[in-house]
Regions:
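Transmembrane alpha-helical segments in integral membrane proteins
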Residues: 2-10, 87-104
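Non-transmembrane, membrane-proximal soluble domains of secreted or membrane proteins
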Residues: 52-79, 92-289
Length: 289
């Protein structure tokens, strides 16, 4: 229907052109001036709406980070948000102000120039400098988070993903995980653990819920039995892909207990959650622990 209407309008314009009829509607100075005056009130209304959205949805944001490295992640996020916010505000103010000040009027023509080296340098170098600061800061934070640790100083565990559940495995009394190999997968050995490896004999396997120690480094290994999953623990600001046929790892130090977070959020039913952050199938949404 819309395409047909557009075609009819085009036919009308072509026929009018052939007849020598001017189809352009005359716009008076008073019309353009009126529209220009509306720009500033619209700008204020737009900013007011943005402030309203921030205020309305602030309670849906994540609470403070419950991990040591998460504080750095939040600081980096806020740093980016401040830069983006300044650019967002400045660009919109200039956009609406120029539409208000330089509206079309009779006898006034805009200056056209094809090239300006100075302008090209400004809008290339300035964003590049800001981007360089963000990248360098981000890399510094990432290198700090992923720096090597001594496994002997951490609680070692593994998260195994499959459609559509998680299984956790702890290193047991020796804090060492037994080896695993996908070729060993069987009904009686769903995690494909190498039972000939003595380190696996005291491994603790849990489903439904797992626990992390507070103020102690946790070294997590991740793997998948089927498709790519992504272990996402939003309150700890931690995420790592689970890839079939290989192990990935991530370490962090929890700093806030469940009881403390319940008090901070004033939510007696609060619990930390592990979710899959990759669309892995029909009931991906239910893959939580």
């Amino acid at each position: 229907g819309i395409v047909a209407i557009a075609r009819l309008v085009k036919v009308y314009e072509l026929s009018a052109t052939l007849k020598g009829v001017d189809t352009e509607e005359a716009v008076s100075d008073s019309d353009t001036k009126f529209n220009a005056k509306l720009m500033m009130p619209f700008l204020l209304a737009f900013f007011a709406f943005c402030i309203y959205l921030v205020y309305s949805y602030k309670d849906n944001l994540l609470p403070e980070s419950a991990s040591e490295h998460g504080v750095e992640i939040d600081r980096l996020f806020n740093f980016n948000l401040i830069i983006i916010g300044i650019v967002f505000i400045a660009v919109n103010i200039l956009l609406f102000y120029f539409a208000f000040k330089y509206y079309s009027r009779k006898g006034v023509k805009a200056t056209y120039f094809a090239h300006s080296t100075k302008l090209e340098m400004i809008w290339t170098i300035v964003p590049a400098l800001f981007l360089a600061v963000i990248i360098i800061y981000g890399l510094a934070v990432w290198n700090k988070i992923t720096s090597p640790i001594d496994p002997n100083q951490a609680v070692v565990m593994e998260l195994c993903a499959e459609q559509f559940k998680w299984t956790a495995r702890y290193g047991g009394n020796d804090n060492v995980l037994g080896e695993s190999n996908y070729k060993l997968t069987a009904d009686l050995n769903p995690l494909a653990i190498d039972t000939t490896d003595k380190n696996s004999w005291d491994d603790k396997i849990v489903t439904g819920e797992f626990h992390l120690p507070v103020n102690k480094i946790v070294l997590m290994y991740f793997r998948s039995k089927d498709v790519i999953h992504s272990a996402y623990m939003p309150h700890f600001r931690a995420q790592m892909n689970c890839v079939p046929g290989m192990k990935t790892e991530f370490h962090f130090k929890p700093t806030i207990t469940t009881a403390e977070m319940r008090e901070k959020t004033k939510n007696p039913e609060f619990d930390y959650v592990l979710m899959c952050n990759k669309i892995c199938g029909a009931t991906h949404w239910s893959m939580q622990m």
